[in-house]
């Protein structure tokens, strides 16, 4: 069984028996999924808001209102409220990152502090990844330097046979953007390595058996400290990775296109690393800091590519490259006692991490459903800008729906939602709200009850979009289930047994 407290995971599993009802459920599920894709959190709020807009909208349409004008009113109001939301937003301070993460993880400050610490170590734009840990405790470690998932080609290269790792300090790197087929091509480089007494790491597209055998024999004889790995990535991405490694280590990639061949290569094309550590699955290269200027230029170049990239996957990969170059990826290992707890905990940490990234991007607002309630108070001013009375009814629907999340939070905390709403609105300070964890009315910013602006914005936009589709739909087309054929009766027993 999967025990979760994550809106989108629950919504994905909801399948209703009635096919018409199921289409409605799928629509609302879309609001949660879209918010999850963009902001990574706020899925439950999207569902509650969408339900509020639909429930209020159906009432007025049933009474004879024009659904097209109503949804126009909803759309225009949502757009205007997004602009109001941006005015209410403030930039997130480093001290508030832990609060954002903790609120998203269900008031778990252990997770909140760990994410804040990870961000402080690798920077706000740094890469933080999640892993399933092997113990019951959560752990955080930072991978210094550039790490990628490629291990040594042959176990004969290991220097520590207990740990099965290869470690070299002040190591030279030979970068080759093609397959090494012939050991003779390497003679120049290897002879210079023996003379200079320095270890060498070869990174190539692949190394054929004959060339590899030569390297292994030299390593086992002890005449050469050497190791070889396949270049990370495939196709175009492999070429980019090799260029990144070259910039980090100050080396040159050997490519036929630029007129550099392996047999002519000497120690001038080699890069230098302060340390390299290789295991069966991964390689870590720590630069010696001498190429800082080139690295900074390369990072700026990749940032321009991120702005031009359209797909999220592409952006993610480019961000990873920046983190590897700029030195450091933080890894959070999520620990738990059981498999079920681990899955649930990992989802929470993921939500918290996404919420923190969203807060860094677009800033923060007061949490606990109070920001949506404050936006409801701004609807009256927006009504005056709308064209006709039916659009104003659409705006009124938004105003009512914006109270739903806070009322539900209050109800879940065991208090009357309407009373809480009145009490919060009676105070003009927009930071003032209801803290469901303690049952107090207080300054929520100071209490650390904070939501990322991006999450609240996505909730509002996607709930309005789903409600518009729902309210303007007239008919539903579904498949008719085939009636199941009645099972055949058992044929009469005519074996004659028992007569």
Swiss-Prot record:
- Where does this polypeptide localize? Plastid, Chloroplast
Single GO MF descriptor: ATP binding
Q: Which GO terms describe its cellular component?
A: chloroplast
One Pfam family recorded for the sequence = Cpn60_TCP1
User: CDD domains, from UniProt?
Assistant: GroEL
Q: Which UniProt keywords apply?
A: ATP-binding, Chaperone, Chloroplast, Nucleotide-binding, Plastid
Q: Does the keyword Plastid apply?
A: yes
- InterPro entries attached here? Chaperonin_Cpn60_CS, Cpn60/GroEL, Cpn60/GroEL/TCP-1, GroEL-like_apical_dom_sf, GROEL-like_equatorial_sf, TCP-1-like_intermed_sf
So what family is this one in?
Answer: Belongs to the chaperonin (HSP60) family.
- Tell me how this protein assembles: Oligomer of probably six alpha and six beta subunits.
Q: What more is known?
A: This protein shows ATPase activity.
- Name of this protein: RuBisCO large subunit-binding protein subunit beta, chloroplastic
Native species: Secale cereale
Q: What is the lineage of its organism?
A: Eukaryota, Viridiplantae, Streptophyta, Embryophyta, Tracheophyta
Q: Which gene encodes it?
A: CPN60
């Amino acid at each position: 069984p999967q025990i979760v407290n994550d809106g989108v995971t629950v919504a994905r599993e909801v399948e209703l028996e009635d096919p018409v009802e199921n289409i409605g459920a799928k629509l609302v599920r879309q609001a949660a999924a879209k918010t999850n894709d963009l902001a990574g959190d706020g899925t439950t709020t999207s569902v509650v808001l969408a339900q509020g807009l639909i429930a209020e909208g159906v009432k007025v349409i049933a009474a004879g209102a024009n659904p097209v004008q109503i949804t126009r009113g909803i759309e225009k109001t949502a757009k205007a409220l997004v602009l109001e939301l941006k005015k209410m937003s403030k930039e997130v301070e480093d001290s508030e990152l832990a609060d954002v993460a903790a609120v998203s993880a269900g008031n778990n400050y252990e997770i909140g502090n760990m994410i804040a610490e990870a961000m402080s170590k690798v920077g706000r734009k740094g890469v933080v990844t999640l892993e399933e840990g092997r113990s019951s405790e959560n752990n955080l470690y930072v991978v210094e330097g550039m790490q990628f998932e490629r291990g040594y080609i042959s176990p004969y290269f290991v220097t520590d046979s207990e740990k099965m790792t290869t470690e070299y300090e002040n190591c030279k790197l030979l970068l080759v953007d093609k397959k090494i087929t012939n050991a003779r091509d390497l003679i120049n480089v290897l002879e210079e390595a023996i003379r200079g007494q320095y270890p060498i790491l070869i990174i190539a597209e692949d190394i054929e058996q004959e060339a590899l055998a030569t390297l292994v024999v030299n390593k086992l004889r002890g005449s050469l400290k050497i190791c070889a790995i396949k270049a990370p990535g495939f196709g175009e991405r492999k070429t980019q990775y090799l260029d990144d490694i070259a910039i980090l280590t100050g080396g040159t990639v050997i490519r036929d296109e630029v007129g550099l061949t392996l047999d002519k290569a000497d120690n001038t094309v080699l890069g230098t690393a302060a340390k390299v550590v290789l295991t069966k699955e991964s390689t870590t290269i720590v630069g010696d800091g001498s190429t800082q200027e080139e690295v900074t230029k390369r990072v700026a170049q990749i940032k321009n590519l991120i702005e031009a990239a359209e797909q999220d996957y592409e952006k993610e990969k480019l961000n990873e490259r920046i983190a590897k170059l700029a030195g450091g990826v933080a890894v959070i290992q999520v620990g738990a006692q059981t498999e079920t707890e681990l899955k649930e905990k990992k989802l929470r940490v993921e939500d918290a991490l996404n919420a923190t990234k969203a807060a860094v991007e677009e800033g923060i607002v007061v949490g606990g459903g109070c920001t949506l309630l404050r936006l409801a108070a701004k609807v009256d001013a927006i009504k005056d800008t709308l064209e006709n009375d039916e659009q104003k009814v659409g705006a009124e629907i938004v105003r009512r729906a914006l109270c739903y999340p806070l009322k539900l939070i209050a109800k879940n905390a065991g208090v009357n939602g309407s009373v809480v709403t009145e009490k919060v609105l009676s105070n003009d300070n927009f930071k003032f709200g209801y803290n469901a964890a303690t049952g107090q009315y207080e300054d929520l910013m100071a209490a650390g009850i904070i939501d990322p602006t991006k999450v609240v914005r996505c909730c509002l936009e996607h709930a309005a979009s789903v409600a518009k589709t729902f309210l303007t739909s007239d008919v539903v087309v579904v498949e008719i289930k085939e009636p199941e054929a009645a099972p055949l009766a058992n044929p009469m027993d005519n074996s004659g047994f028992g007569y």
